[in-house]
Amino acid sequence: MYKRQRQNRKAKAHLAVDTGMTRIGFQVTEHDADEAAKIADLPHIELEGMFTHFSCADQEDKTYCSMQMEKYDKMTALLAERGVTIPLRHICNSAGIMEFDDHRFEMVRSGIITYGIYPSEEVKKERLDLIPALSWKSHVIHVKEVGPGIGVSYGATYVTEKPMTRIATVSAGYADGYPRALSNQGCVLIHGKKAPIIGRICMDQMMVDVTDIPDVQVEDVVTLVGTDGDETITICLLYTSPSPRDSTSS
Protein backbone atom coordinates (compact mmCIF):
# COMPACT_ATOMS: atom_id res chain seq x y z
CA MET A 1 0.00 0.00 0.00
CA TYR A 2 2.76 2.43 1.00
CA LYS A 3 4.73 1.51 -2.12
CA ARG A 4 1.70 2.25 -4.29
CA GLN A 5 1.32 5.60 -2.58
CA ARG A 6 4.94 6.51 -3.29
CA GLN A 7 4.47 5.53 -6.93
CA ASN A 8 1.26 7.58 -7.09
CA ARG A 9 -0.64 4.49 -8.21
CA LYS A 10 -3.79 2.82 -6.93
CA ALA A 11 -3.83 -0.68 -5.47
CA LYS A 12 -6.75 -2.73 -6.76
CA ALA A 13 -8.74 -4.45 -4.01
CA HIS A 14 -11.68 -6.83 -3.76
CA LEU A 15 -14.01 -6.51 -0.79
CA ALA A 16 -14.84 -9.74 1.07
CA VAL A 17 -18.41 -10.00 2.35
CA ASP A 18 -19.51 -12.58 4.91
CA THR A 19 -22.94 -13.77 3.82
CA GLY A 20 -22.94 -17.04 5.75
CA MET A 21 -19.60 -18.81 5.38
CA THR A 22 -18.49 -17.14 8.64
CA ARG A 23 -14.87 -17.15 7.52
CA ILE A 24 -13.73 -13.67 6.46
CA GLY A 25 -15.36 -10.48 5.27
CA PHE A 26 -17.52 -7.51 6.17
CA GLN A 27 -20.92 -8.17 7.72
CA VAL A 28 -23.99 -7.05 5.80
CA THR A 29 -24.84 -4.12 8.06
CA GLU A 30 -25.14 -0.36 7.78
CA HIS A 31 -22.02 0.02 9.92
CA ASP A 32 -19.87 -2.28 7.80
CA ALA A 33 -21.17 -0.68 4.62
CA ASP A 34 -20.02 2.67 6.01
CA GLU A 35 -16.57 1.22 6.70
CA ALA A 36 -16.36 -0.28 3.20
CA ALA A 37 -17.32 3.06 1.69
CA LYS A 38 -14.48 4.71 3.62
CA ILE A 39 -12.06 2.21 2.10
CA ALA A 40 -13.43 2.95 -1.36
CA ASP A 41 -12.72 6.66 -0.75
CA LEU A 42 -9.05 6.13 0.07
CA PRO A 43 -6.91 7.91 -2.54
CA HIS A 44 -4.63 4.97 -3.32
CA ILE A 45 -7.24 2.17 -3.27
CA GLU A 46 -9.38 1.16 -6.23
CA LEU A 47 -12.24 -1.01 -5.03
CA GLU A 48 -12.33 -3.17 -8.14
CA GLY A 49 -14.47 -6.06 -6.92
CA MET A 50 -16.60 -7.59 -4.20
CA PHE A 51 -17.00 -11.27 -3.41
CA THR A 52 -18.52 -13.78 -1.06
CA HIS A 53 -18.39 -17.56 -0.97
CA PHE A 54 -21.17 -20.15 -1.09
CA SER A 55 -21.03 -22.71 1.70
CA CYS A 56 -23.77 -25.09 0.49
CA ALA A 57 -23.98 -24.65 -3.30
CA ASP A 58 -23.04 -28.28 -3.94
CA GLN A 59 -25.96 -29.56 -1.86
CA GLU A 60 -29.44 -30.34 -3.15
CA ASP A 61 -31.17 -27.92 -0.78
CA LYS A 62 -30.42 -24.40 -2.00
CA THR A 63 -32.22 -22.54 0.80
CA TYR A 64 -29.00 -21.39 2.47
CA CYS A 65 -27.60 -20.27 -0.88
CA SER A 66 -30.68 -18.15 -1.50
CA MET A 67 -30.11 -16.43 1.84
CA GLN A 68 -26.47 -15.77 0.92
CA MET A 69 -27.43 -14.30 -2.45
CA GLU A 70 -29.97 -12.02 -0.79
CA LYS A 71 -27.32 -10.78 1.65
CA TYR A 72 -24.84 -10.18 -1.15
CA ASP A 73 -27.41 -8.23 -3.15
CA LYS A 74 -28.25 -6.20 -0.05
CA MET A 75 -24.59 -5.29 0.47
CA THR A 76 -24.38 -4.22 -3.17
CA ALA A 77 -27.40 -1.97 -2.61
CA LEU A 78 -26.00 -0.55 0.65
CA LEU A 79 -22.78 0.41 -1.11
CA ALA A 80 -24.67 1.91 -4.04
CA GLU A 81 -26.55 4.12 -1.57
CA ARG A 82 -23.16 5.40 -0.47
CA GLY A 83 -22.03 6.10 -4.00
CA VAL A 84 -19.85 3.00 -4.32
CA THR A 85 -20.10 1.04 -7.58
CA ILE A 86 -18.50 -2.40 -7.82
CA PRO A 87 -17.21 -3.19 -11.35
CA LEU A 88 -16.46 -6.87 -10.71
CA ARG A 89 -18.93 -8.83 -8.61
CA HIS A 90 -18.24 -12.51 -8.00
CA ILE A 91 -20.03 -15.03 -5.83
CA CYS A 92 -20.15 -18.29 -7.81
CA ASN A 93 -17.76 -21.13 -7.10
CA SER A 94 -17.86 -24.31 -9.23
CA ALA A 95 -21.23 -25.45 -7.92
CA GLY A 96 -22.60 -21.91 -8.11
CA ILE A 97 -21.57 -21.63 -11.76
CA MET A 98 -23.65 -24.72 -12.52
CA GLU A 99 -26.64 -23.83 -10.36
CA PHE A 100 -27.22 -20.05 -10.36
CA ASP A 101 -27.47 -18.39 -13.76
CA ASP A 102 -28.66 -15.07 -12.31
CA HIS A 103 -25.68 -14.62 -9.97
CA ARG A 104 -22.73 -15.23 -12.25
CA PHE A 105 -22.31 -11.46 -12.57
CA GLU A 106 -19.07 -10.17 -14.12
CA MET A 107 -16.77 -12.87 -12.75
CA VAL A 108 -16.89 -16.44 -11.47
CA ARG A 109 -14.36 -18.58 -9.60
CA SER A 110 -14.12 -22.05 -11.08
CA GLY A 111 -12.33 -24.53 -8.85
CA ILE A 112 -12.94 -28.27 -8.96
CA ILE A 113 -14.66 -28.10 -12.37
CA THR A 114 -11.37 -26.86 -13.83
CA TYR A 115 -10.19 -30.44 -13.35
CA GLY A 116 -13.26 -31.74 -15.16
CA ILE A 117 -14.74 -33.05 -11.91
CA TYR A 118 -18.24 -32.30 -10.59
CA PRO A 119 -18.40 -30.58 -7.17
CA SER A 120 -20.73 -33.27 -5.82
CA GLU A 121 -23.27 -35.87 -6.85
CA GLU A 122 -26.08 -33.43 -5.99
CA VAL A 123 -25.42 -30.79 -8.65
CA LYS A 124 -27.32 -30.84 -11.95
CA LYS A 125 -24.73 -32.55 -14.13
CA GLU A 126 -26.78 -32.13 -17.30
CA ARG A 127 -26.01 -28.41 -17.18
CA LEU A 128 -22.32 -28.91 -17.84
CA ASP A 129 -20.62 -31.74 -19.70
CA LEU A 130 -17.30 -32.28 -17.95
CA ILE A 131 -14.41 -34.47 -19.04
CA PRO A 132 -11.79 -35.30 -16.36
CA ALA A 133 -8.54 -33.51 -17.15
CA LEU A 134 -6.36 -35.61 -14.87
CA SER A 135 -4.55 -38.78 -15.87
CA TRP A 136 -1.86 -40.81 -14.16
CA LYS A 137 0.04 -43.52 -15.97
CA SER A 138 2.88 -45.90 -15.22
CA HIS A 139 4.41 -49.02 -16.82
CA VAL A 140 4.71 -52.74 -16.29
CA ILE A 141 8.25 -53.51 -15.10
CA HIS A 142 8.00 -57.28 -14.53
CA VAL A 143 5.73 -60.19 -15.46
CA LYS A 144 5.74 -63.69 -13.98
CA GLU A 145 3.52 -66.76 -13.74
CA VAL A 146 3.05 -68.61 -10.45
CA GLY A 147 1.06 -71.59 -9.24
CA PRO A 148 -1.42 -71.83 -6.36
CA GLY A 149 -0.53 -71.11 -2.73
CA ILE A 150 1.95 -68.31 -3.43
CA GLY A 151 1.91 -65.25 -1.14
CA VAL A 152 2.08 -61.82 -2.73
CA SER A 153 3.76 -58.75 -1.18
CA TYR A 154 4.22 -57.80 2.48
CA GLY A 155 2.40 -59.98 4.97
CA ALA A 156 1.29 -62.36 2.21
CA THR A 157 -2.19 -60.85 2.54
CA TYR A 158 -2.99 -62.26 -0.89
CA VAL A 159 -2.37 -65.91 -1.71
CA THR A 160 -2.87 -67.25 -5.23
CA GLU A 161 -5.52 -69.90 -5.71
CA LYS A 162 -5.72 -70.49 -9.46
CA PRO A 163 -3.67 -73.21 -11.16
CA MET A 164 -1.74 -70.40 -12.82
CA THR A 165 -1.76 -66.70 -11.97
CA ARG A 166 -0.01 -64.19 -14.18
CA ILE A 167 1.26 -61.26 -12.14
CA ALA A 168 2.49 -57.92 -13.46
CA THR A 169 4.53 -55.58 -11.28
CA VAL A 170 3.70 -51.90 -11.81
CA SER A 171 6.13 -49.07 -11.13
CA ALA A 172 3.99 -47.02 -8.73
CA GLY A 173 3.35 -47.14 -5.00
CA TYR A 174 2.36 -45.20 -1.91
CA ALA A 175 5.49 -43.02 -2.05
CA ASP A 176 4.14 -41.73 -5.37
CA GLY A 177 0.82 -40.87 -3.71
CA TYR A 178 -1.09 -44.01 -4.62
CA PRO A 179 -3.37 -44.92 -1.68
CA ARG A 180 -2.14 -47.99 0.19
CA ALA A 181 -5.72 -48.48 1.37
CA LEU A 182 -6.44 -49.89 -2.10
CA SER A 183 -4.27 -52.94 -1.40
CA ASN A 184 -6.28 -56.03 -2.44
CA GLN A 185 -9.17 -53.70 -3.36
CA GLY A 186 -8.30 -51.34 -6.20
CA CYS A 187 -7.51 -51.93 -9.83
CA VAL A 188 -5.56 -50.43 -12.72
CA LEU A 189 -6.16 -50.48 -16.46
CA ILE A 190 -3.96 -52.41 -18.88
CA HIS A 191 -4.88 -52.91 -22.55
CA GLY A 192 -8.28 -51.38 -21.82
CA LYS A 193 -9.15 -53.94 -19.13
CA LYS A 194 -9.23 -53.85 -15.34
CA ALA A 195 -6.37 -55.57 -13.54
CA PRO A 196 -7.05 -56.06 -9.81
CA ILE A 197 -4.37 -55.10 -7.31
CA ILE A 198 -3.19 -58.15 -5.36
CA GLY A 199 -1.26 -57.95 -2.12
CA ARG A 200 -0.19 -54.85 -0.25
CA ILE A 201 0.89 -51.83 -2.26
CA CYS A 202 4.62 -51.25 -1.77
CA MET A 203 6.51 -47.98 -1.52
CA ASP A 204 7.19 -47.70 -5.26
CA GLN A 205 5.65 -50.85 -6.74
CA MET A 206 2.43 -52.83 -6.77
CA MET A 207 1.38 -56.18 -8.17
CA VAL A 208 -1.69 -56.76 -10.30
CA ASP A 209 -3.38 -59.89 -11.66
CA VAL A 210 -3.22 -59.94 -15.47
CA THR A 211 -4.20 -63.59 -15.93
CA ASP A 212 -7.25 -62.58 -17.98
CA ILE A 213 -5.46 -59.89 -20.00
CA PRO A 214 -3.58 -61.38 -22.95
CA ASP A 215 -0.06 -60.40 -24.00
CA VAL A 216 0.87 -58.13 -21.09
CA GLN A 217 4.57 -57.35 -21.38
CA VAL A 218 7.23 -55.22 -19.73
CA GLU A 219 6.90 -51.52 -20.69
CA ASP A 220 3.15 -51.81 -21.33
CA VAL A 221 1.29 -48.66 -20.25
CA VAL A 222 -0.65 -48.90 -16.99
CA THR A 223 -3.42 -46.37 -16.33
CA LEU A 224 -3.83 -45.54 -12.65
CA VAL A 225 -6.15 -42.59 -13.28
CA GLY A 226 -7.75 -41.93 -16.65
CA THR A 227 -9.32 -43.79 -19.55
CA ASP A 228 -8.10 -46.81 -21.46
CA GLY A 229 -10.51 -48.10 -24.08
CA ASP A 230 -14.00 -48.27 -22.61
CA GLU A 231 -12.82 -48.28 -18.99
CA THR A 232 -12.22 -45.24 -16.78
CA ILE A 233 -10.76 -44.76 -13.32
CA THR A 234 -11.42 -41.28 -11.93
CA ILE A 235 -9.44 -39.52 -9.23
CA CYS A 236 -12.60 -39.68 -7.09
CA LEU A 237 -12.61 -43.48 -7.25
CA LEU A 238 -8.95 -43.63 -6.34
CA TYR A 239 -9.20 -41.84 -3.01
CA THR A 240 -11.43 -42.82 -0.11
CA SER A 241 -12.31 -39.25 0.90
CA PRO A 242 -15.91 -38.28 0.05
CA SER A 243 -14.66 -34.99 -1.39
CA PRO A 244 -12.73 -34.89 -4.69
CA ARG A 245 -11.06 -31.68 -3.49
CA ASP A 246 -8.77 -33.64 -1.17
CA SER A 247 -7.17 -35.41 -4.11
CA THR A 248 -7.01 -32.51 -6.56
CA SER A 249 -5.43 -30.05 -4.13
CA SER A 250 -3.11 -32.31 -2.13
Q: What does each of the following model-derived ranges do?
A:
Residues R6-K12, D18-H139, V143-G147:
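Active-site loop/helix belt of alpha/beta enzymes
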Residues A133-N184:
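Functionally critical, mid-to-C-terminal surface segments that flank or help form catalytic/ligand
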Residues A181-L182, L189, V216:
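Short, well-ordered loop/turn sites that connect or cap secondary structure elements
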Residues G229-L238:
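Short, Lys/Arg- and Gly-enriched loop/turn segments at beta-strand edges
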Residues G173-A175, K193, R200, L224-D228:
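Short, surface-exposed secondary-structure boundary micro-motifs
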Residues M1-Q5, Y239-P244:
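Conserved small/polar residues in nucleotide/adenosyl-binding loops
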